[in-house]
Amino acid sequence: MPPSPVENPARRSLLLLGGLAVGGMLAGCAAIQQQNREPTEEPSPEPSRKPERDAPKKPVLYLYPTRTMDLSVSLDYEGTLTYTYPTPQARADGGVTWQVTAAPDGDLTDASGRHYPSLFWEGKGTTILTQDEGFVVEADAATAFLEDKLSTLGLSEREAAEFITFWGPRIAERGRALVTFASEEFARQAIYRFTDPSSGAEIVPDTFIRVYIVVGDAPQTAVREQKLVPAPARTGFTAVEWGGTER
């Protein structure tokens, strides 16, 4: 009588190997069907970080008195200051005051003897400056545009160079930007006061030049071109400020 399949070791091995092979094929088919049913999901891109609105970037203040003099420079800003340099004295009313010695060439010295070319601050505002008008600026025209407009608005070549090296790349990187000069509106948000630290007497600059821009993406529709008023000639004690914000 021949042995049963269960009693045949060779046959038992063949059956076991065959079962494993069939099982592997079935598992592979199931995996392929699962892939066909579930399309691969692409990872979501990182959300782009837009520049903050109403956040002044690098307002800097230059001072050019007719003689070397000690000055208290107070700033009242309609918003929150986020950074200042050099560090001013904080006032109880929320404003700040710098104590400096200013020279006719613009050099500023604090009580420790450290020298500065300007007073710097940044903050977050509470209102939105509009862009109802302005200039549409292409990336390759940003430098020439700024040189021309800053000269009209009264910045010296050194001041303009510092402005352009900060704002030029920010305008150009947009490809096509809308640039609005909002100096008067910003001047109502950031108010300076200059006094003699010894007597407390107010010192009013003979010439105060302020340049503040708003940079945004150029819209598809036409924008009314802004008319700029040329700056007055510099006479006497001159103060100069420039800064801006991005949309």
Model segments located where?
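General helical structural elements
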Residues: 15-16, 41
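Bacterial signal peptide processing site
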Residues: 30-32
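Protease-labile, long low-complexity intrinsically disordered regions enriched in Pro/Ser/Thr
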Residues: 39-247
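N-terminal secretory signal peptides
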Residues: 1-10, 16-27
